[in-house]
């Protein structure tokens, strides 16, 4: 891949899990970002332990050569909470802008079961036509607001949400304006659709409108256990549904090849949440960085 086009980041969720703070509670913010840099990454997303004052956070990252590239934002348009979502989005956007980020990765969390004990496949939510329209209108408005700061909004398709499957991604992308983008996540695409082919089809179809990429691998044997026992998303994470690129079933070589051939410019973020007591975050960060160097050449 062209190293002038692509930068590599890693998410802090491997050190401390924001959805389950007990996973990795012993890992400090400074340990986390120091190990990111030591493993060879130059970017990070924002975790729950990160200072939220740019004047405090930026120097701590600068000294380690780490840049903020994105931070999760939850939207609740389908639930009808448009004004509250937009007010909170503006504060979030201003923080990311101050940190030098260009992308705002959002997830539509109305009816989401990702943080509950419900079976991630059996009890996933579905939106009504009216709710879909609220989501599309809301994201179009967020994109207009972000444009004023020279930033772009993207939707993170995610297990346990109303925008998870290929069909749901298709519907979302057909309803929003062209200046609303997609955050492509290899792990969530594979987990939802069950095959490399289906994952690649999403990437190929929407690559011109993908402005942020999450790299996570999947352990098929854990997915099989999740399905067989009707486990929740978080139960799956604790058992090891996800891991870093090169440690699971996904072949990332065609992913990197397609991104390179189509001239993708932006961040690729290793975002692979698992139990840090079972998968040492630093060791797995190094493993991911080596795999990317070997397979993507960057």
Curated annotation (Swiss-Prot):
<keyword id="KW-0456">Lyase</keyword>
<dbReference type="GO" id="GO:0050114">
    <property type="term" value="F:myo-inosose-2 dehydratase activity"/>
</dbReference>
<dbReference type="InterPro" id="IPR050312">
    <property type="entry name" value="IolE/XylAMocC-like"/>
</dbReference>
<dbReference type="GO" id="GO:0019310">
    <property type="term" value="P:inositol catabolic process"/>
</dbReference>
<dbReference type="GO" id="GO:0030145">
    <property type="term" value="F:manganese ion binding"/>
</dbReference>
<keyword id="KW-0170">Cobalt</keyword>
<comment type="similarity">
    <text>Belongs to the IolE/MocC family.</text>
</comment>
<keyword id="KW-0464">Manganese</keyword>
<dbReference type="InterPro" id="IPR036237">
    <property type="entry name" value="Xyl_isomerase-like_sf"/>
</dbReference>
<dbReference type="InterPro" id="IPR013022">
    <property type="entry name" value="Xyl_isomerase-like_TIM-brl"/>
</dbReference>
<dbReference type="InterPro" id="IPR023952">
    <property type="entry name" value="IolE"/>
</dbReference>
<dbReference type="Pfam" id="PF01261">
    <property type="entry name" value="AP_endonuc_2"/>
</dbReference>
<protein>
    <recommendedName>
        <fullName>Inosose dehydratase</fullName>
        <ecNumber>4.2.1.44</ecNumber>
    </recommendedName>
</protein>
<dbReference type="InterPro" id="IPR030823">
    <property type="entry name" value="IolE/MocC"/>
</dbReference>
